[in-house]
Every structure is written in structure tokens, then in C-alpha cells.
């Protein structure tokens, strides 16, 4: 944001993915996330503000409190994500499919923030296993994310329950016994395997073999007549 005005003027920026029928900001998909920045002017000519301690996933931004009529060059959206090089490309004869691929790449980058997030806009922004499991293959083929996933997988391994071998469903996160679900925790061995298939590096398997074995043994203790009980999260909608 580039702005000028009297000292003490308060500028508020609110972010959302949609607008209502009347043109007002629709923050429904933000859930409990405030998605709001407030900047107070010094009053010394043109000033520039950019968030340093947060990020926002949005399509629309509402600017409140400008002391002058706004100009298009006063506001700029900047893309922020983990610095991963583009390593894959896709072309075909169908512009619609190519457009879907471009949108997928943008969605993926928007959720690479040191770990694979579930969403960049609302009040979670967490490393849910289910989301990472269904997108890791695409991320590995489109971007140089082997180091990214190596770091994430190492965190999962270190955070494994030392008592019974169980694995949580979110990382990074301290382990808590929150009804772990194999349909989500199994992202751990799945993503390890995907990294190996893409890289051919057996170190992925060697590093995580023991932790994965302990996890499979844990699932065996939960099974009844070789059938695991119903867990709470399941496919969770689109994931």
C-alpha cells in the first residue's frame, strides 16, 4: 500500500475471496480469521506499508480510511510462498485443461509456506496430512519440492508418539492424542514413497523405514479381526 495523509490517519485493509451481491466484502470463507491489516500514517509524505508478520489468501481487498481518492498504482498484490523452482510443464491442445493446470500451480504455490498448508485464507493454515497426501504428487512434478517435503517428513518422524508409534494428522504440531485417523496419518508413508518415485533416492526410504514400520505396527494393535475401526475424519469432503 502506498499512501499519504495527515499524521494519525488509520488505514484498514480487509481481505476476502468473494464479494456479496451488493458489492460488499464477503468474508464467510475466512471463518474466524480476521484477515485485516491496520496502518497508522506518520504524516511525512508518501508512505509504504507491507505486512511483515502475516500473509493473506484473497481475491478482493477492501481499503478503508484513505484520505484521498484512490489510484490503481497505490495498491499492489505480492505473491508470497516458499522459494521453489519450477521444474515441470504441461501443454496440450485443449486451452481449458491448460488453464486448469495453471490454476493448479497457483493454488499449490499459495499453500507452500514452509510446510504444505490446507488453505492460505481462513483460520487454519495448517499442515493437514490429507491435503498434503493428495497434492504431493502434483507438487513434486511441477516444482523442486524434494527438499521441502524432506523437511516436512523429518518433522513428522521426530514427532511420532514414542510410546506406541502413532502419528498425528497435522504437522508441524506437537503430538496430541486426537483420535488419529489412518486415512490421514498414512500420508506419511505415501508421501515418502512419492518422493522416492520422483527422485530415485533410497535415502528417503532408509530414513523413514523404522518410523513407518512402527506406525504400521501401531495400526495392527488397533485392528479387530484385521479390520480397523471407523475413525472420525474420513475423506472430509473434497480431500
Predicted regions located by residue number:
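Hydrophobic core segments within long, regular secondary-structure runs in both alpha-
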Residues: 98-101, 105, 146-157, 189, ...
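Well-ordered alpha-helical scaffold segments within catalytic/enzyme domains
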Residues: 66, 134-145, 188-204
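Aromatic- and histidine-enriched alpha-helix N-cap/loop-to-helix transition segments
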Residues: 123-133, 144, 179-190, 207
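Tryptophan-centered motif/residue detector
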Residues: 128, 152, 184, 188, ...
